[in-house]
Amino acid sequence: MAVNENEIGTVQTQATAPAPQPTAQRQAQRPTGAPGSTTGINHLMRRSGRLDGSDARSADALQVFTKVKEEAIRHQDLPDDFDIHRFDRDAQQVGMAGLLIVKLAKDINGSMKAFVRTLVLDNLPGTRIRPRTHKINNGLTDDIIEEKVLPRDVFTAQYWSKIGEFLRNRYNIPGLEVLSAGPRAVYADFDFKDELAVKNLLVESVNICEDAIARRNNETPFSIATHIKAENEQLTCNLDYNGIPVKDSCGNPIRSDMVISTSRGKKTNVPENEFYDTDSQLNQVSLFVDLHWTPTTGQQQGMFGVTLPGAALPPQFTPYIVITDVRKASWIQAWTLEMWLFALGNAYRATASQAWARTLMPKIATSKMRDIGALGYYSELGKAIETRTEAFMADDSNFVMLMNKMVNQNPAFQIDIDPMGDNSAIEQVILDAAGGVNQARAVSLIFQALTNLYGTDFRQFYNLAEAGPIIFDNHHEVDLGHYTDEHGELSDRRDLDVLGAMNMSEGNDQEWKTWYATQVGNDHIVRRMNNSKGFDKMYLGNVTYTGRARRLTFNPKFITAMDAAAAAAGVTVTMENLITNFGQQRFAGYTGMGNMAVSGSAQVGMAGSMGQTYGAPSYNAPGTWY
């Protein structure tokens, strides 16, 4: 849902509702179909039995969630101050059923509100629901394309309006304002028998409702100047290259070629309490590097501005660092826009000593799709380069030479926004900032959050009039889902990126470019994504699709402005395992960057030192209103 002018993730509902009825009648009441329509047959001519079982999943979900709620309250993991409501598909005449996690609370003005996290339950296979049908002209005739209905297609203004009406009747409070704490899709393969997973989803949902309540009541926002201020502490970043996918709250794998985690710990030579003052992780951001084909002409300039010998072509590919997941540490309960932006900013640490490039280094055990040697198809050689050999991997300079020759050395930054994901309430603000009727309000909220976070007016670091929008929407949508990889493990469908398709097409230029056109071409988006699924089937096998994300591109000036604001706030960041050189050569400093590529690299200290402090610490900067 869109950002409301008064509240992040707020969705205004009608101010009045039908007069309340006795509880027994309210629970039995079912809306009827429109006069003369077939949708209301089962409501007008009701019978007891049913075969489609379309609401059985919501009944099962409610039973398990209620059981888990009672246990969590008994163990004092949750307070007994929230409700769980079943929102039936048939009773409400909506495309998918849902569970509503609801907290009633008064706002700062004493007005009672309902804060709702909506868990939209994806239909099980075989459930009666009409696919979306598109008629798209191809120049001569029309293509008829059927598209599976996703939870995000169902969670519309009409769906939300019905939730508001349902809750006003349920609580018997006419005029109750119902505010969204963000939707979450629960896909068909989620196992409600896994009570630990259900508990995590429930606790997360309750906390997200409380995040919305706290924001509505002007809670003092998270601030580095306020919350990370001990002079004997420092922030440390750890780079993890193991490539194991992280999981979302529903157990779906998320591509994580690099995970950058931020922790707060004691500075060197400062004694610690062995059992208490251990490093505390604060957040983490997951990413991978997609190499986009950006063919150019002319000679290639390598390190130090030297023309590389024998290079007839400049680098043909530009790295895009794609952020796939932003999350807090599990021990932290609150999750606000300030905290999300704090975690996001650490993605820029991947530029330190070109750390992002290490995600592309060849490894014998990695998937064929990750073989950087496929870049050779678009070099003077015209064929793949053998990189997964002991001879190639014995000397890092081989990798450095290949990267210098084929890849621009300043990356751009992108992020995948899932409007039905774990961070839907926060990330809707980012999506709105990329365009639409709420853009100005969303950008204002982000600037205020960054001011709160760093203790200095963010406009000092980023001038909108001069720098332009902070993020761009090129209407690039990405299917979310998972497949079984060659090791028998569930993996993220996004493994099939530009390099992956290049490897799978095995040098067939026409096939690879046809695949590429399904990702970033100018064709109708529905037809592109339908054709993309055909390549998924060819290259990945059976794919379970769970949703769709919008891939946005950050303005590079915004990324560097966040880093500058952190430096001015006196943030000390030490990189624990940063490797600065590949063999004897460093892959850094190429001056020819694309329009969206960042220049320079993140300001960090090195492990083993006291860290590097930029600017004077401002530990007592006041938190500002939000």
Swiss-Prot record:
Q: Which keywords appear in this protein's UniProt record, sorted alphabetically?
A: Host cytoplasm
Compositionally biased residues, Low complexity: 12-32
Keyword Metal-binding in record: no
Asked if Lipid metabolism is a keyword of the record, the answer is no
What exactly does this protein do? Self-assembles to form a proteinaceous shell that encloses the viral DNA and compartmentalizes proteins and DNA during viral infection. This micrometer-scale compartment contains narrow pores and is the site of viral replication, with the proteins involved in DNA replication localized inside. Provides a surface for docking of capsids during packaging. Probably protects the viral genome against host defenses.
| Protein species of origin | Pseudomonas phage phiKZ
Annotated localization? Host cytoplasm
Q: Subunit arrangement?
A: Homotetramer. The tetrameric protomers further assemble as a square grid.
> What's any one GO cellular component for it?
host cell cytoplasm
Region annotation (Disordered) maps to: 1-44
> What is stated as this protein's family in its record?
Belongs to the Phikzvirus chimallin family.
Protein name as it appears in the record: Chimallin
